Amino acid sequence: MKSLIQPLMRAAGVCVITDGAAGNERQALALAQAMRLTPTVQRVALRAPWRWIGPAQTRGVRFAMPRAQWRALSRPWPALAIGCGRHAAVVTRALRELSKGATYAVQILDPRIDPAHFDLVIAPRHDGLAAPNVIQTMGSLHPIDDARLAAARAAFPLFAKLEQPRTVLLVGGPRRGLELDTAWMTRLIETIDRWHERDGGSVLISTSRRTPAEWRERLRGAFRHGCTCFWGGDADGANPYAGYLAYADRIIVTPDSVNMLSEACAT
């Protein structure tokens, strides 16, 4: 039976649905890739009122997005729809209902409605979501494995020449429910600077879209003993994130990103 699943899904179609947020899309694609499926990706920007109501109401959902996008999602119904995030949950629930079960709907992250509206819900354990069709994970889904780390080492060979220990700092930023201020960042910089002075080695820093501009500028020239590599965006060249993970001796992650924490643990 298992040998039939992949051919059937390839024939009938697999789609990944997100709001376009990188963290959400990365999780949904990681699941599809782990199943050795090649999905189409639909990034939905829901119109009002669906973007306010969320998955609690799916009536008229075809009007929540451009007509061409709804047609791409529903003609034919995909065999498998993988959604991640609240806006995606509107669509994955609707596909399951309107297709009369022809679409197997998988929702990643707590949809904040009864999980019974989906075939499968995958949510981190800290969300506290429990139901017969819920799989709890320790962190977030991600694509990091030995093969990807080996590929990253091959793609960033210069990192192998950096002095050890290689300390990687992955920086996000403040978000709702988590206060990270300038004083907190100052303490973090001072701690890493003391480690660097004591142990030597290299410091490699990466920031994200959520990182305040003030933090980014401070981090760029923060360490008395020098920062070996700093990446703050496309202006700094190719994103070295995968290479950082592959070569790190120790990784420090700001606590705002479950995705980055999970991927760091996978190394």
Q: Residue spans of the language-model regions?
A:
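Catalytic binding pocket for nucleotide-activated donors in carbohydrate/polymer assembly enzymes
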Residues: N259-T267
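Short, structured helix-loop element that forms part of the nucleotide-activated donor/catalytic region
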Residues: R210-F223
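A nucleotide-sugar donor-handling region in carbohydrate enzymes
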Residues: P115-D181
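Active-site and donor-binding regions of nucleotide-sugar-utilizing enzymes
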Residues: V16-I17, A21-Q136, H142
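Donor nucleotide-activated moiety binding/catalytic core segment of transferases
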Residues: R220-M260
